[in-house]
Amino acid sequence: MKLLLFTALVLVVISLIEVEAENERACIPLEKECTKTPGNCCSGLKCDCYRRFEQGVAKGIQCWCIEKDVTYKGV
């Protein structure tokens, strides 16, 4: 019985350590691509996505970490 309780306690501790490690993963810095992980930009940044066109044909969506209060306009 004690072995069973000890094993359960060890498993709980290991799972808590894994969750904490996942929460501390490295964030994506300014102007780096965040298409696959949009919620992982560093503090003060947001993941902003754009649809890319080549000769009028959509070629997919690309996302970049940019500053939260900055707006970009085409030239």
From Swiss-Prot:
Contains 4 disulfide bonds. It is found in: Secreted. Residues 22-25 form a propeptide. Residues 1-21 form the signal peptide. Keywords: Disulfide bond, Secreted, Signal, Toxin. InterPro entries: Spider_toxin_CSTX_knottin. GO terms for molecular function: toxin activity. Disulfide bonds: none annotated. It comes from the Eukaryota. Its main location: secreted. GO terms for cellular component: extracellular region. Expressed by the venom gland. Coiled coil: none annotated. Belongs to the neurotoxin 19 (CSTX) family. 06 (U6-Lctx) subfamily. This is U6-lycotoxin-Ls1d.
